[in-house]
């Protein structure tokens, strides 16, 4: 079954808040992105329950450690039943390859996606930590590393989507945060794009948070966004 194009960022701090939000979302039409905040608060059992209820889950924990540890971490994620799991490309080829190999034991492994440059980071932020490349140059460099390591795709900003599809091919998956409908505030994301423009640019899976989670009616907000991209 094809994965949903939209993953709702569940940036909640409690199970009650998460349950309330998920109850307003259509399983099968949107997926759930579970990040460090929620996963640390309520753990894998809650995530597994959402999978059992029909939701596709993107486990956004951005693993970055020694190869053996990351391999075990993605294995644990796959056992929960998530559809997408990610690692930091800056962990290097050996780490990414170890994660890829660890997932070969599963009949239906999750997509293994690499994080390139966080969408909150500007060129000056990269320069501050010793990276002289622009954000776009660094994204491409890390994306190529991820592809060479056998990963399924990368997390990137929508602005880099056309470049990555052109250089790495259409089968290399792009997962993109910083998606905001035209009438939404940009928040703390510095590189944003509308859902329609993101799809046109080649984005495969969009992560959308506040425009849905802080909407007066999350159900209606989801329906409006799905309509805007022809879903």
From Swiss-Prot:
Keyword terms: Decarboxylase, Lyase, Pyrimidine biosynthesis
Alphabetized GO MF terms: orotidine-5'-phosphate decarboxylase activity
Binding site for substrate: 11, 33, 60-69, 119, 180, 189, 209-210
CDD domains documented for this protein: OMP_decarboxylase_like (cd04725)
GO CC term, one of those recorded: cytosol
Name of encoding gene: pyrF
Role noted for this protein: Catalyzes the decarboxylation of orotidine 5'-monophosphate (OMP) to uridine 5'-monophosphate (UMP).
GO-annotated biological processes: 'de novo' pyrimidine nucleobase biosynthetic process; 'de novo' UMP biosynthetic process
Entry's family note: Belongs to the OMP decarboxylase family. Type 1 subfamily.
Annotated protein name in UniProt: Orotidine 5'-phosphate decarboxylase
Subunit structure: Homodimer.
Catalytic activity line of the entry: orotidine 5'-phosphate + H(+) = UMP + CO2
EC number of this enzyme: 4.1.1.23
Pfam families from the UniProt entry: OMPdecase
InterPro entries in the cross-refs: Aldolase_TIM (IPR013785), OMPdecase (IPR014732), OMPdecase_AS (IPR018089), OMPdecase_bac (IPR047596), OMPdeCOase_dom (IPR001754), RibuloseP-bd_barrel (IPR011060)
Enzyme active site: 62
Organism: Idiomarina loihiensis (strain ATCC BAA-735 / DSM 15497 / L2-TR)
Claim: Acyltransferase is one of the keywords in the record: no
């Amino acid at each position: 079954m094809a994965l949903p194009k939209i993953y709702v960022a569940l940036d909640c701090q409690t199970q009650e808040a998460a349950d309330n939000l998920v109850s307003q979302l259509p399983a099968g039409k949107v997926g759930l992105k579970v990040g460090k905040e929620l996963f640390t608060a309520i753990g894998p059992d809650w995530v597994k329950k959402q999978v059992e209820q029909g939701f596709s889950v993107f486990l956004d924990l951005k693993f970055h450690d020694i190869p053996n540890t990351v391999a075990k971490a993605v294995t644990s994620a796959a056992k929960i039943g998530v559809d997408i799991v990610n690692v930091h490309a800056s962990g290097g080829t050996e780490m990414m390859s170890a994660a890829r190999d660890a997932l070969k034991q599963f009949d239906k492994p999750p997509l293994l996606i690499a994080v390139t440059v966080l969408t909150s980071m500007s060129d000056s932020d990269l320069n501050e930590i010793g990276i002289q490349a622009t954000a776009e140059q660094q994204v491409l460099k890390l994306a190529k590393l991820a592809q060479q390591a056998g990963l399924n795709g990368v997390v990137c900003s929508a602005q880099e989507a056309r470049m990555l599809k052109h250089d790495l091919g259409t089968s290399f998956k792009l997962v993109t945060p910083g998606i905001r409908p035209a009438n939404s505030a940009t928040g703390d994301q510095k590189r944003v794009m509308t859902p329609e423009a993101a799809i046109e640019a080649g984005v495969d899976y969009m992560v959308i948070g506040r425009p849905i989670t802080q909407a007066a009616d999350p159900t209606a907000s989801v329906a409006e966004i799905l309509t805007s991209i022809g879903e």
